[in-house]
């Protein structure tokens, strides 16, 4: 969305796009001017899980002349809304943090990194991180927030320790919500801006003992596999004899 001057003599608007940080804007579409104060464009040819994108909107007058927009940080055009940058959230499992935080050595972790949203006139008030576990619905409340007013230089990353979720199937999904501040003449964007949904799976861990002693001494009485992050879907456990016959089988 982009707010425009509905009194300007404009024929249409050029939509320009560049991939993350390469500053190579190319035209991807046009938006006809119909006299409203807001224009909309949907970019369907993107890979939001691989890249974040930058956009610029250029007005084109009735003579076909594209009107150059001002630099993004030009103080004379402080209320310009013709530039935008999306959020890319990336995740990675079990990074080696031994040199940074040895307490994480024995933990299962998901590391999340994302870039700044740009650019709202009211700037970003805060970022909110939401999580889904085991393909369940996302949390209604964020599991973490980043306050960009009181701590604007806080790094945009998060280490999610997921060791306690080992009984699940190991599937985790995340997304970021950006909230606009109130210092804007047009009012903050009520719906915010969202990143891609980034999903990741922890590596299944299975340990199967080779003996057990059901002799009543309360040690190793039960033979069963010990699992972490193993899905119950299509699970089966079968014990075979040396000759290949099935001794025991279960889906529990």
Identify the role of each PLM range.
Residues 19-23, 61-63, 118, 133-137, ...:
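Solvent-exposed strand-loop boundary residues in beta-sheet-rich modules
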Residues 11-49, 126-168:
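Recognizes extended acidic, P/S/T-rich segments that occur
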Residues 54, 130, 159, 172-177, ...:
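Exposed, low-structure sequence patches enriched in small/polar residues
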Residues 1-8, 49, 63-123, 183-216:
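Pro/Thr/Ser/Gly-rich low-complexity, intrinsically disordered linker/stalk tracts
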Residues 12-14, 56, 99, 111, ...:
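Conserved beta-strand and immediately adjacent loop positions that scaffold enzyme active sites
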Residues 97-98, 195-252:
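Short loop/turn motifs at secondary-structure boundaries
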Residues 41-67, 160-188:
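Beta-strand-rich modules
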Residues 8-10, 122-124, 230-234:
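Short proline/glycine-enriched turn/loop motifs at strand-loop junctions of beta-rich domains
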